[in-house]
Amino acid sequence: MLFNCFGILALLQILPALAYPPCREQMSDPYEFGESDLMRPGMHDTPLSLMQKREALAISLSKRDSVGSYAPYNVTCPSDYMLRPASDGISSGEQSFIDKRIPKINTQMRSFISNTGLDVDVNSVINDSDGPRLGLAFSGGGLRAMVHGGGVLNAFDSRNGNGSSLAGILQSAMYIAGLSGGSWLVGSVAVNNFANITYLRDNVWNLEHSVFAPHGDNVVENLAYYDDLDDEIDQKKDAGFDTSLTDLWGRALSRKLVDATQGGPNITFSSIRNQTWFQNADYPYPIIISDSRLEEEKAIPANTSIFEFTPYEFGTWDNGIKAFLPMEYVGTHLKNGVPPDHKCIRNYDNAGFVMGTSATLFNTFLLEWSQEVTSNSTLYDIIHKVFEKLSEDQNDIAPYPNPYQNFTTTNTTVKNPFERFDTIDLVDGGEDDENIPIWPLLHPQRFVDVIFAVDATYDDSNGWPDGSSIVTTYERIITYNANKSVDVRGFPYIPDEDTIISLGLNTHPTFFGCDGRNTTAGNHTVDNNTPPLLVYFPNYPWVYYSNISTFTMSMNDTLSSGILENAALSATQNNSDSFAVCLACAMIQRSLERKNMSTPSQCSSCFEQYCWNGTTVNNPSAVSNYAPTVLSASTTSGTSSVRAKPIVFYLFASLLTVSLLL
């Protein structure tokens, strides 16, 4: 059993009961206890009967007989050299998907733009493989980000028949990327045959119960649940692989996100390729990202390597490596691209483990917590001992056998940061403060023309985004593109957070980079190397307060419906037909510029209204004073002022303790 991992988690859950040191996003909001997070009062104090223990074990064993194994296994490698240089462009598999998807995108986008009434010859703008390419990017932010992003995605989806003015945008997109809570959204739709959000919410996500207590106050079912988790992780450990908190986290998440018995212990991310929607290229190509952390690091540097998981490949475009491993062989340790003894690993890319990797919040939580707790010396000592142990044991990360050991790239100016390590340690995709997965959509080989960046980040003390995620991406490009450690096409100019808040750029969708000749790439003729136009969709209380804590792990129907509705109305600007026209303008702008076609007068008006015009504001108090209120009354039942109740961490400890006694 994973006594180390469970013991650490148990201690983490108990500590908040002793004191309430705030996380960064909870400075003004102490832990609240909600009924949806609680099990029956006093449950953990009541001794379990022998009958209850036996019943839980019987349930657990019966379920295990019907599912596959979580354990990775050895296979013979398909070739002696397993890495693909990224200088070749995107993989042949991704290219094949894109080639199949282009005609479908062109048809859908022509239909969407025609339906908006935009006065443009859509057949001239969208007629070949050089037509507009749209990428969707969904931020991190736990369950808040998943449900908010789901509301936006629902508004973009033409399958719903809900009269959304933006219906068809999903079907018009080439890529869809997610990190952390956004990876739960992207991963869940991709793994579940791209089911729509209504189906997932009603049948899969089980939002009313916490991932830590999925069966509410049913003691026996919850004990069986933890016994199943323990058994699955032991399968991987017994097969000879390192395990970490992320295995536990990923298996628990899978039961919320994957529509299969026990969350599909043997369902892999690469198996998405076998699903009907993917084989037909009916929906955008999914990408999940995660940050790397070197063994000696406790904090994530701004220039950390960003890794991506796709149905075909795992790797990074950063110039220190710039090479990819086939996704189905993730978990294979390579030396200079060659597998020892011709042995490769399969089944390591478990879908839940991948989503858990992108959302490994534990080390950020611990780091900030350990820095905040100073008033109680005993508590301070306990927390720091736990923190030091995690750092030493690397249990706060997701360990991946290193495919880049002793690997040397063709780029002689940047060193491979992982060349001496046996494992690559991956952490939450937002820990570098780039909390929207824009990065994978900026690579020249993907030719993305416009990015819709959906931001549900908890930036300020009140829980609303202030634009810092796109500011950080902009700063990374300015800093590291210059020294050639990264290779992207550039980015639109982005103002600082003071300006974003002072000008209200985070209160509605805002366009950046409307003029393709005025970006970080310089004043050049617009072509396929021009940086994309960015449409920023911030979370904002249009009809509902959706600024719940990242550590909220359950929602009742009123709350989830309120967040979904608020997200849709905020994204569509109250289902505005005129805003749909403006989004159509953003979608085709780079194509118009490339083809040297004139901008329609409707688009000129749109750009005056929604594009940042370059104005900056020096207002240091803007961020701290930002506290928006709802614009109008919600049509959702209940009140819009309902706040979510974050998970009661210490109850998880009691469950773990009891389950370990089985």
From Swiss-Prot:
Signal sequence coordinates: 1-19
InterPro entries: Acyl_Trfase/lysoPLipase, LysoPLipase_cat_dom
Keyword Glycoprotein set for record: yes
Residues carrying sugar: 74, 127, 162, 196, 266, 274, 303, 376, 406, 411, 483, 518, 523, 547, 556, 574, 596, 613
Keyword match Kinase: no
Enzyme class: hydrolase
The protein's Enzyme Commission number: 3.1.1.5
Catalyzed reactions per annotation: a 1-acyl-sn-glycero-3-phosphocholine + H2O = sn-glycerol 3-phosphocholine + a fatty acid + H(+)
Gene Ontology molecular function: lysophospholipase activity; phospholipase A2 activity; phospholipase activity
Location in the cell: Secreted
Keywords annotated in UniProt: Glycoprotein, Hydrolase, Lipid degradation, Lipid metabolism, Secreted, Signal
All residue ranges annotated as the PLA2c domain in the record: 76-617
GO terms, biological process: glycerophospholipid catabolic process; phospholipid catabolic process
SUPFAM superfamilies: FabD/lysophospholipase-like
GO cellular component, one term: endoplasmic reticulum
Function: Catalyzes the release of fatty acids from lysophospholipids.
Protein family per UniProt: Belongs to the lysophospholipase family.
Protein's recorded name: Probable lysophospholipase 3
Species of the source: Schizosaccharomyces pombe (strain 972 / ATCC 24843)
